[in-house]
Amino acid sequence: MMDWTDRHCRYFHRLLSARALLYSEMVTADAVIHGDRERLLAFNPHEHPVALQLGGSNPARLAEAAAIGADWGYDEINLNVGCPSDRVQEGRFGACLMAEPELVAECVAAMRARVPSHIPVTVKNRIGIDAQDSEADLNRFVETVAGTGCRIFIVHARKAWLQGLSPRENREVPPLDYGRVCRLKAAHPELTIVINGGITSLDEAEAHLQHVDGVALGRAAYQTPWLLAEVDRRLFGTAGAAPSRRAALEALLPYAERHIAAGGRLNNIVRHILGLYHGQPRARAFRRHLSEHAPRDGAGIDVLQEALALVEGHGAPALAAAE
């Protein structure tokens, strides 16, 4: 998700789940080719498995960007054919490409040819756009792209209106149609179909997994990140208890110290953890303290320690930033 799932967000989420596949923000192919790759593509090895999501519509440039992403160590290369924003449409990528399945297939084929065979090239799409939203349209899109060898589709269970709705409205106004995604899977058992859109709990995720192969969580994972702490046990069958919220913060401290020592700002990290105590007593005090103090010049990990003391009680001992 653009402006959300940067490297700091992903590192934090990995502290909560060892197994969930994490996605980068969408990066345009041209930015990958011509931009600051260290800033755009670098990530901590602890983030694995991590996917690079690309935006674009030029097969040759997408292929080059995909090859670069593979060289940087990403575990999956994903093509975004689901974002409906005006800015994205002006660049001729995102959801508007669902009107051109043959072009998407050409892009995916070019990417596949430049990426090692063990790295999946996947597509994220909607169930339709504008008036092109029948099940036949969705099946044609998926079948056309699958003909290139693409085997994984992450399907947002809403259509997108390319005109008249903001990106936020496109996440809320078009009705969810989970049944259509389930029927897509039933029609194509050979494909891996991952459902996305409006899923806010692991109970819902478990219900969907009776019909599809995977579940993609977006805003729920960001706004209430603690739900990721139960993902390994409930969805992957991993033994052992989830880490505590305190333990997650303790594990984040050395990372934050290194980032600050390298010239970074504490708020680059803290803005992603504001929802950690969502629904817990004194969560508001936790968020308020971080929001007020982390953006300040010179803010250090003491801000995190103070916020923890507020949320867990004033008698909570300060954390030590130990490796």
Predicted segments with their positions:
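Alpha/beta catalytic cores of nucleotide-metabolism and tRNA/nucleoside-modifying enzymes
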Residues: M2-D3, H8, E106-A109, R114-P116, ...
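Glycine-rich, positively charged N-terminal anion/phosphate-binding segment
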Residues: M1-D75
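Glycine-rich, aromatic-flanked loop segments that form ligand/cofactor-binding clefts
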Residues: R19-G35, I77, V81, A95-E106, ...
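Non-cysteine beta-strand/loop elements that form the S-adenosyl-L-methionine
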Residues: S24, D75-S85, G147-A160, L217-A220
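Glycine-rich tight-turn/loop motif centered on a GG-T
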Residues: D86-V104, E135-A136, G164-D177, T238-A239
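A cross-domain feature marking catalytic cores of carbohydrate-active enzymes
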Residues: M26, L54-G56, V81, V123-I127, ...
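Glycine- and other small-residue-rich loops at beta-strand/loop junctions that grip anionic moieties
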Residues: M2, L54, C96, E100, ...
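Conserved radical SAM core fold
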Residues: T28-I33, G56-P59, G82-L97, K159-G164
